[in-house]
Amino acid sequence: GYFMDPTNKHMSSLLLKCGLPGGMMGSMMADLKGVHSGINLILRSKNEPELSIDDLLVMLFDEVEYVWPKLGYPPLVTPFSQYVKNVALMNVMSLIKGEERWTMIDNHTWDMILGKSGRLPGALAPEIIALAKEKGYEFTDEDPQKNYPDQLDEYRKEMTENSWDFGQDDEEL
């Protein structure tokens, strides 16, 4: 928490175009630095010019701008902004390797796409819907809160059994 890469503040204005929150800059740069050498290794093996970290950052922002509407315009707040960034980064890596987009989507992102986190503000792109069907995934429009039943009575019982203080109101539980 105390160290911030000094280059982050110089590049954060690039976030305006793709819409990602500025608070993601540190983790995003760490992700990029983590894959940078691997990407350049792939490019060298294909006799293609290597990318600077700045070039890679611009590619990532362009890909975020591309994937965000295709994923139904999820709100770019935690955790959805990370999902969008992760899909974009995986797409960039896939494209550099000569593969197609959408080959590496993690389970949390699929849960968002399928509606398990609630309805997305926009429509999913037909290619995303087709990919989900191809994988045998099912979409849902159920209330995501049903996945988290009220357990307040269980917590009260546990607190009583352990002689723990209940606090001043239910919010403190």
Question: What feature does the model see in each segment?
Answer:
Residues 1-3:
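A structural-propensity feature for long, helix-poor, extended segments
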Residues 9-173:
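Terminal or standalone catalytic/regulatory effector modules within metabolic enzymes
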